[in-house]
Amino acid sequence: MKVVSSYGVEIKKQNIPIRHTLYIYRQAVGYLIRVYEESWEELSRIVNLQKRFNAAEHLVHSTKKNRARYDFDQKFPKMPSYLRRSAIQHALGSVSSYETRLELWKQKKLDGKPKLVYENHAMPVFYRDVMYKEAEDQTDRAFLKLYDGHDWKWFSVNLLHTDMEYLRENWSGVKASAPTLEKRHHKYFLRFSYTEEVSLSKKEVNEQIICSVDLGINTDAVCTIMRSDGTVLGRKFINFPSEKDQMYRVVGRIRRFQREHGSGQVQSRWNYARRLNMELSRKVASAITTYAQNNHVDVIVFEYLEMKGKAAGKKKQKLRLWRKRDIQKLCEQQAHRTGMRVSRVCAWNTSRLAYDGTGEVIR
């Protein structure tokens, strides 16, 4: 099984033209989306995706043997070839998705007419050797080819030391994909993806050891290590009270601010609360998988928690802040990296009925 993991390395603040590069790349993608929307009837006849991509590139890029139909090369001169192909791929995907959704809408299989967005939020990929180079002396630096407003030049960028230490410690020897530029919280990152080939546990059901996880609101998780015959080998209560207390205090301050000033200026405060909540999810997921790994578990079992509709009652805000799905997704990613499987069971009657099917549990 292939497991893909990614990690974002922060680019330290310095005088490099990242915003110029991002602007020109998004302008190129927007231009290409308009071109391929006009030419989609011609491109859609080409079934083979590679041939369709080649035909799309020939429409906008001139060579010795090809004369482009559109003036892309004049509008975006000297754009690196790999960056141009990345923009073409993004534009083709956007137009193809729009046309597919439009057909579904015409067949009344989709509610609401889809809209093709030209003002996109595409992020460039820095392909190795032509757009991105690592520093040879193993320092916290890299070289990126960026647009300075006049030409494409190589710039040295400093990367955050702690992020680079993490990559050297945990991902040394694993081949990384070309980094993608990312912007989060007014900061820029280079996101690296790593692909690993892992083999999951193949033990027979009767020989498996499972970790049953009961996610909760007051107590973050209760982990029980069990054999197939019901023998309990261990139990652990996972709770992060200080982190939850910090988050609830932030939510309380937001509530008081909204009561006095309205809800027009609280977006940044809610973003901070969400980041605290997501960090809590990461800690809970890491604690679950670490405990399961220490007990040589084959399968981590969760309840399938599906909560639809409007929550009611005094605890409705706590229910909405409960990131049960994020915890399960993070656990699944971490468990697969270590060879453990993840399973989900229906939550109905899991406390009422006995594990072996003998009936209701008398308490």
Regions found by a protein language model. Give the residues of each.
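Nucleic-acid substrate recognition interfaces
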Residues: M1-R363
